[in-house]
Amino acid sequence: MQFVVTAMDFKDPGALDRRMANREAHLASVRKMIADGTFLSGGAILDASDKMIGSTLHLEFPDRAALDRHLQGDPYITGKVWEHIDIKVARLVPLKPK
């Protein structure tokens, strides 16, 4: 199943610092997901001043439970970066043929 995940950061004064402190671990997780085919695309959501305030992810997992298990271990979850997460099932256009 394919999913569109929109995750908005906490808005407290320390939110960006937590994001930056957890960024390398989060990106290491993304690199693993790219290698195993579960990460299709994604990136940071920016505000009007180019400050990172959230993330969007296009992911593929066998089912919603597998996605939920993955998200629970993401450094942006465990590091209190993402506050609100919206998950929708999607049918995404492939970037390259399989």
Where are these regions (language model features)?
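Conserved, structured core segments of small domains
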Residues: 1-98
